[in-house]
Amino acid sequence: MNTQETDFGDEIIQDDLPVHTIPPRYIFLPWHRVKKEFIRRTQWNDLTARMIKRYWLQQLKQPEEEWSLDESIDAAVSVVVSADIALDRTLKCLVIPGEDLLDIRALWRDVNELNCHIRYLGFNESFGSSQKGTRVHVANNAVLSLPRVYPDSCVVPDRFESIQSRDSQAFSYLKQYGPYHVVNLDLCGSMFPNTVKDTSEYYTALNQLLIYQFANQRCEWLLFITTMVEPTVIDADRMHALCKPTRENVKENGDFAKKLKTFLPNEAFRNVEASINLKNFSKDQLIQLFGVALGKWLLALCQAAQPQWTIAMRKSFKYSINEEKGAVMLSLAFALNPNITPPVDETGMAKLELAAKKYPTESECALKLAESVFQIRDVDETLAADAELKSKLRDSHADLLEAAGYDRAAYIKWVEEGEKTTND
């Protein structure tokens, strides 16, 4: 073969081969801090693994998998995605990933032993996985090469908020890849009512998401919402609007009102018909109020749906992102369950023995929500009190970042020197 032919052939091969690696990175950003690994491992992935084991395992069970032929005793196990993998038996995830897809990499790491296939749709405002030359493209290629990752998983260059329009490209993708077992909304912005930026797009998009999920999902699913909360810029009027379901519960549910008084100022809801009295709220109490209000807003939507849905807050956390401004990230987790009841024959004509299925009432859900908000844990305090845990998380995060093209030793040094960024 002549040189011209060789070059021509090389070009074809290079175009077809996915790019997996780029030069190592040495600059680390706020979301590379150990506390983010805590959230991934302790909240997102632990809760997902629990749901797989308890509820989803059978529905995610695939036909017998094909194993690669080059395995040896010492070789890493690899799985070839078979052509007969059932699409409706994949763990379907909706995410808002960064350019390195660290959340998806971590999810795969922590649930791969459960032998389920992951299929994901990601929204990234800057770049999509089909755009060659971007880190998102490289990262997506690397993730797709992992065992049990469905090959059409992708990241599209769009905002999650765009799904609020049913005519948008984003909503079209939402339908194509759903319904979802896991929705992880790791937001760059804030759902906390504030005077800096309007939050209505987030609420509209989340409402649209729930409409879609309620119409198409028939099993329990997880919703993670990570949002910035900055009490110093609270929009009192918008907070009052968000708290409408909360105020109604205070008026109608004595147990709920009593529970709120254990961690919020007593005079806050003294006149539920008027605006909430925010005068004596501390910053921590405003964060708790927002947690309750957002949870009650979601619960109201669940109760308005037909059939209704039960929602429960799972273990949730907060951590500081700007001590001077009192800003924190609130990482909330919710499990949503459809209230589907089988038809029971009360005449005795049918011989099936079916007990009427009972679900928690709205009042019971509201009370448990208030209790869960009160139990939100501070990640900074947890890590400060447990050096061994922080060390383990640092090392596991270093492994994750190294797989994504970062220099491991540089990351360890960065953590040991206080995790400072250019904005500090």
Predicted feature locations:
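C-terminal target-recognition/interaction regions appended to catalytic cores
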Residues: T3, F8, I340-D424
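SAM cofactor-binding core of SAM-dependent methyltransferases
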Residues: G9-F171, G348, T361-A387
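Local beta-strand N-terminus motif with an aromatic residue
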Residues: T90, P179-Y180, E220
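Short, flexible/disordered intra-domain loops and linkers
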Residues: Q131-V136, D167-Q169, F192-Y203, A236-A241
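A short, conserved alpha-helix within the catalytic core of class I
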Residues: Q164-R166, G189-Q213, R218-C219
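A short acidic, Gly/Pro-enriched loop at the edge of an enzyme's catalytic core
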Residues: S168-V182
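Conserved beta-strand signature within the Rossmann-like core of class I S-adenosyl-L-methionine
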Residues: A215-P231
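A conserved mid-domain beta-alpha-beta active-site/ligand-binding segment of alpha/beta enzyme cores
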Residues: C243-N339
